[in-house]
């Protein structure tokens, strides 16, 4: 069972992606508890570069990762895409983005928040990004909540 699945869609911003992913990887406290699910668009002209970045930064860690190439119809679709077909069991999922930068032990903080507030996985933790007050741009969701709603982001 994967304690924390990180859903990371990306498109056409390899430099920003590299920076954000490097912070996620470098600041993991529990790499064996983290699995990244990367969503890439097959028509993205930078897809090969993005794959190289992922393999360079993730291969040397204990974190697992899966790369899926496909077709997204927009940002919301890209965030939600690929998760229904992901075949490894997981407890919680958090959305990552190339404009959000991880702080030290971000993964421990996320798993601790879920354990404290929704130990049964039936809930959603609202993390503010410092910019939006009315939109949850960094959703963290338990599996039971995801199964009920059928999406992470809308």
Range-by-range predicted roles:
Residues 22-33:
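Short, acidic, metal-binding catalytic loop of nucleotide-sugar glycosyltransferases
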Residues 32-45, 67-70:
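Short beta-strand/loop segment that forms part of the nucleotide-sugar
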Residues 38-52, 100-101:
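A conserved acidic beta->alpha catalytic loop
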Residues 70-78:
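A short, glycine-/small-residue-rich helix N-cap motif at loop->alpha-helix starts
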Residues 80-92:
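Active-site nucleotide-sugar/metal-binding loop of Leloir-type enzymes
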Residues 90-101:
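Short beta-strand-to-loop acidic/aromatic patch adjacent to the donor-nucleotide binding site
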Residues 100, 104-138, 144:
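Conserved donor NDP-sugar-binding/catalytic core segment of glycosyltransferases
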Residues 143-154:
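Aromatic-glycine-rich donor-binding/catalytic loop that engages nucleotide-sugar donors
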């Amino acid at each position: 069972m994967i304690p924390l699945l990180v859903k990371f869609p990306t498109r056409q911003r390899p430099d920003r992606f590299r920076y954000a992913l490097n912070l996620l990887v470098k600041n993991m406290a529990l790499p064996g508890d983290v699995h990244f699910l990367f969503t890439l668009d097959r028509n993205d002209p930078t897809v090969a570069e993005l794959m190289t970045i992922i393999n360079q930064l993730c291969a040397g860690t204990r974190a697992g990762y899966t790369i899926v190439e496909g077709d997204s119809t927009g940002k919301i679709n890209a965030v939600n895409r690929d998760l229904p077909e992901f075949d490894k069991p997981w407890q919680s999922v958090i959305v990552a983005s190339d404009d959000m930068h991880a702080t030290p032990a971000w993964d421990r903080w996320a798993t601790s928040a879920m354990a404290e507030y929704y130990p049964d996985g039936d809930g959603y933790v609202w993390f503010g990004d410092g910019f939006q007050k009315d939109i949850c741009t960094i959703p963290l969701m338990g599996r039971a909540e995801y199964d009920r709603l059928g999406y992470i982001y809308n």
